[in-house]
Swiss-Prot record:
Protein localization: Cell membrane
Entry note about domains: The protein kinase domain is predicted to be catalytically inactive.
Superkingdom, natural source: Eukaryota
Keywords, alphabetical: ATP-binding, Cell cycle, Cell division, Cell membrane, Glycoprotein, Membrane, Mitosis, Nucleotide-binding, Signal, Transmembrane, Transmembrane helix
Function, in words: During early embryogenesis, controls asymmetric cell division and the asymmetric localization of P granules of germline precursor P2 and its descendant P3. Probably upstream of tyrosine kinase src-1, plays a role in endoderm development by controlling spindle orientation during EMS blastomere cell division. Controls EMS spindle orientation probably by promoting lin-5 and gpr-1/2 enrichment at, and let-99 exclusion from the junction between P2 and EMS cells.
Organism: Caenorhabditis elegans
Membrane-spanning parts: 471-491
Gene label: mes-1
Protein name listed in UniProt: Protein mes-1
Record Gene3D superfamilies: Transferase(Phosphotransferase) domain 1 (1.10.510.10)
Length: 966
């Protein structure tokens, strides 16, 4: 019989649907018909709300009879389906159509309409829906008039939408609601950036439409998707099930933001580091209870989207609440744990026969406005629990070996005598009260010392005084030795500084300066001289025949390495060495090496050897050494396994000392090398040790680089370096990479950020090069100076510099996006997209005056993979989905790129930037339109739900750069 009934419904579905579509039923008749179906077939069920109240709602889900009744309302002319519920719907429609009841129409039913919350999910494109859409689902709250019952009406909820120009409004969704709160679902296209929605609600009773039409306010789709703010406040704290419960309320009228429906409360007490979570779905009560809180504690509450487990994720709302003691929340003290014992004291029994007895006394007093009074407690206490712990005691090693003493004491007693294993030990006694419900009071502690003597006497007996004097003498002697060592180190430092200052004056008198030299190409001509104290010296002031001596390179903390030369120039007035500095100093003491000691060819004598930026080990010499025929470096693989890759002999390179890279899980060393045959600079990457893990990692990177197609914004793979290792010829011992002389993007950001935040990096007296003109007040980085230049031709404003810098960052962002697009299109992920792995191709001396063809390149493919199962991630670079246990995909690279964009927006000062409100170090830079584009892109990349692709970001930044060039 059931199978026959199912086949009957299935056979009648198609013609019935066709009839319903061809015969459109007016809403004025359909609404009251649905109301009668709900009254007839709907089931009333009790639902527990977030406010822990009972709500009576009509439940029509999975209700076949109600569905048939609705079908009868829509198909009032169809006669082939003879089911009672279907016929009831048809008869209800006919009665509404033919009967006009004399019932007064109600003027007001709804006072307001709210979108309580919305959750978003992504619907990918398919054959039926060529464009991707966002599915939004949430809760709607209908505020009824005071004397309107919840079950008196049904509601038609329509979702209206409009574009940015607000010229046309269309209905994108219609849904029926049978209660004052219900769920809605509608779609929003992903390609629309500015999209507003609102609700239109029509009300019906069993006779027709009532109360007019109500509207909610307009909400922008971007504000809905960001969900950055929720107005949350504490409503009350109550006693609940032996614990405290905090009731929070959310105010929708105070903000235009629409929160997510799936939320969680992340909280912890001030005395604990454990994070607790309370997941909930926001309902029409706009409240939530957080239960199982401890009394008399302070809690930090954070509201976040559901599924968030990272402390660094920005919260939608936060609050710090103080839970009062239990007795402040109840009228009956028997509902609380007993108060702690008071007047806890001890005495030793000094009788010769009872030397090991200890007497403990205590009282239990009542509450009175938070203070103890002399009245004994009237609430039922079952017993007292006493614990005595032996303490570590001087001159008695046995004390710490004794077991803890535990006694259960009847409630009627207020003192206890018990034996201890050793009276020469000190003890800590703990006392708690336990009531009939096994609730334990706070612990009261007291320390017990031998024979009631002061604590220090029990630890320092008369026989120990000589030992203590000796110990004090040792401590004083050790302190004196450390003080002498500190004074000696300070003296040596001051002596070195004095020598350096003397050499400065001596060289200044001779017309010598130690400068950073910037060139157009790796072997090109000198275009600018920047001395060590960041002062600029025009090239015209330098002797045309520059005699350069390669100096020991300066290593900055996380900074770039620029080559330093000793340059000679003509001084109009010789500089005298101060009298107090007039002492002998030889050239051997200045710490600089002469370049003639490292000549390997006349054409390369003035070339700049720039080490890789990730250097940690200081080297006393940077002589360029000839490579031997046999290399001590670990072989990666035989060359016949990679014979399709260009190879270069190791003996053809001049190699600097290898230096270790500052990065977790790095398996390689880096050095800058010179190919003496081709006269070009390269970066060489070699294994750092001989372990199988290192060799496997290097071989894995080589496999990746051989399949990666070249790209203009990826650091170019130049081939492999081969050599003999032991008795094995033609072994791959290193990976040759394009040399990038400009250092990392992080160093560039730090350089411009420090200028913006500090305005000046040096004072006038810091530079001996500026002594040609003692009245010069030139600031570091001339482009930021508001003074006129030497010819007073024009004034360069800060606004122009910040415009240029912001556009430069957008250009860099476009180039990195293009590199990521290239990687992702090949099915690969980088996994280390940071500003430390983005390199500037050309060198620069002034970060505000770089070459126009400056580009950035993405490098360090040591952890790049094509299979997401093989990803090895840095703990600090894990996107939210990976923390939740999902696979690392291309969107993880986008999240890391968002951190790079945030670093650009904040000019490297990430400690003062907040996710969602990224701030730069300079107001002018922060308020630029191009900086706003960077900031918006960073927010989109750091979203936990939806992120743009690399191609989308590339298009965004390209449009900004094209507009800047027009």
């Amino acid at each position: 019989m059931k199978i026959h009934h199912f086949l009957t419904l299935l056979c009648t579905f198609l013609p019935l649907t066709t009839t319903a579509l061809t015969n459109s039923t007016p809403l004025s008749l359909l609404g009251p018909c649905y109301k009668r179906c709900v009254t007839k077939f709907g089931e009333t069920k009790e639902q527990l709300t977030n406010a822990e109240t009972i709500s009576l709602e009509y439940d029509v889900s999975n209700n076949t009879e109600f569905s048939l009744c609705k079908l009868g309302c829509n198909s009032h002319e169809y006669t082939d389906l003879n089911l009672a519920a279907f016929r009831y719907g048809q008869l209800a429609y006919q009665k509404i159509l033919t009967t006009v009841e004399d019932v007064p129409t109600r003027g007001t039913v709804l006072n307001d309409v709210f979108i309580v919350c919305l959750d978003t999910s992504f619907m990918p494109s398919n054959n039926s829906a060529p464009s991707a859409k966002r599915l939004l689902s949430g809760t709607v709250l209908l505020v009824l008039d005071e004397d309107v019952a919840k079950a008196d009406n049904v509601f038609l909820i329509e979702v209206l939408a409009r574009n940015a120009d607000k010229s046309a409004v269309q209905v994108i969704s219609q849904q029926w609601c049978y209660s004052s709160n219900c769920n809605i679902t509608f779609n929003a296209p992903t390609e629309v950036s500015s999209f507003d929605v609102r609700l239109r609600v029509s009300t019906f009773d069993s006779n027709g439409q009532v109360g007019g039409i109500n509207f909610s306010k307009w909400h922008n789709i971007n504000q809905i998707l960001t969900k950055t703010f929720v107005d949350m406040s504490l409503k009350s704290v109550v006693w609940k099930a032996e614990k405290a419960a905090a009731n929070f309320v959310f105010n929708l009228t105070a903000s235009d933001h629409v929160p997510a429906c799936s939320l969680q409360m992340i909280y912890r007490s001030s005395l604990s580091s454990e994070l607790l979570h309370r997941n909930f779905y926001l309902d029409h009560t706009l409240e939530v209870f957080v239960n199982n809180l401890d009394f008399d504690k302070i809690y930090t509450m954070q509201l976040a989207p559901s599924g968030t487990h990272d402390r660094s994720t920005p919260s939608l709302a936060s609050a710090v609440i103080e839970i009062p003691p239990c007795r402040h929340l109840v009228d009956d003290y028997s509902m609380c744990a007993p108060p702690p014992v008071s007047s806890l004291s001890y005495n030793w029994n000094l009788s010769p026969t009872s030397e090991y007895e200890l007497l403990i006394k205590w009282k239990l007093l009542n509450y009175m406005d938070g203070l103890n009074v002399t009245e004994e407690l009237s609430i039922p206490v079952a017993y007292f629990l006493l614990n005595a712990h032996p303490l570590i005691t001087a001159n008695n090693e046995q004390c710490e070996k004794y077991e803890k003493i535990r006694r259960v004491v009847s409630y009627g007693l207020r003192e206890l005598v018990f034996h201890v294993p050793d009276t020469d030990c000190n003890y800590e006694v703990e006392m708690t009260a336990v009531d009939t419900n096994q609730r334990i009071s706070e612990v009261k502690k007291i320390q017990v010392f031998r024979f009631n003597v002061p604590p220090y006497v029990s630890f320092l007996q008369a026989s120990d005084i000589p030992t203590s004097v000796e110990l004090m003498a040792v401590v004083l002697a050790t302190s004196a030795i450390f003080a002498l060592i500190a004074l000696f180190l300070l003296y040596r430092k001051r002596k070195r500084d004095k020598k350096a200052r003397f050499q400065m004056y001596k060289d200044a008198e001779a017309g010598v300066s130690y400068d950073y030299v910037a060139t157009t190409e790796s072997l090109g001509s000198v275009v600018q001289i920047r001395s060590t104290n960041f002062r600029f010296e025009p090239v015209e002031n330098i002797d045309g025949n520059i005699e350069a001596a390669l100096a020991q390179q300066q290593k900055f903390e996380g900074g770039t390495m620029n080559s330093m030369f000793r340059t000679y120039y003509n001084l109009d007035h010789p500089v005298k060495v101060p009298a107090h500095m007039a002492e002998a100093s030889s050239d051997e003491d200045n710490g600089y090496e002469n370049i003639r000691y490292s000549y390997f060819g006349s054409e390369l004598s003035d070339d700049v050897f720039e080490e890789d930026i990730y250097m940690t080990h200081k080297s006393l010499s940077i002589y360029c050494q000839d490579s031997p025929l046999t290399t001590p470096m670990a072989p990666i693989a035989p060359y016949e396994h990679f014979d399709d890759i260009p190879s270069h002999q190791y003996r053809n390179f001049q190699v600097h000392n290898f230096n270790e890279r500052i990065e977790k899980q790095a398996y390689w060393l880096m050095a800058t090398v010179v190919d003496v045959v081709r006269r070009e600079l390269y970066s060489l990457k070699v294994p750092k040790d001989y372990t199988p893990e290192t060799i496997s990692a290097m071989r894995k990177e080589l496999e990746f680089l051989r399949t990666l197609a070249p790209h203009g914004n990826c650091r170019r793979f130049e081939g492999v370096v081969i050599g003999r290792w032991d008795d094995l010829p033609r072994q791959v011992i290193g990976i040759l990479i394009e040399n990038t002389r400009g250092g990392t993007l992080r160093n560039y950001i730090a350089a411009v950020g420090s200028v913006f935040r500090n305005c000046s990096l040096a004072t006038d007296h810091d530079s001996f090069a500026s002594q040609q003109d003692m009245n010069s007040t030139q600031h570091p980085f001339d482009k930021l100076s508001t003074e006129a230049d030497e010819n007073n031709s024009k004034k360069v404003k800060i606004q122009e510099i910040t415009d240029s810098l912001s556009i430069r960052f957008c250009q860099f962002a476009e180039q990195v996006s293009s590199a990521l697009e290239h990687l992702h299109s090949a099915g690969s992920v980088h996994t280390r997209v940071t500003t430390l792995n983005i390199y500037l191709l050309h060198n620069y001396s002034d970060p505000f005056d770089m070459l126009p063809d400056q580009v950035v390149k993405l490098g360090n493919f040591g952890f790049a993979v094509q299979n997401s199962e093989d990803v090895v991630l840095d703990d600090n670079l894990q996107p939210p989905e990976v923390i939740k246990g999902e696979k690392y995909e291309a969107r993880g690279d986008i999240w890391q790129f968002g951190l790079c964009l945030a670093e650009m927006c904040s000019l490297g000062d990430l400690e003062q930037s907040e996710v969602g409100t990224l701030k730069s170090g300079h107001d002018t830079f922060k308020n630029l339109p191009s900086t706003q584009v960077l900031r918006d892109a960073a927010k989109r990349c750091l979203s936990a739900r939806t992120r743009p692709s690399a191609s989308d970001l590339c298009g965004v930044f390209k449009s900004v750069n094209v507009a800047a060039t027009v």
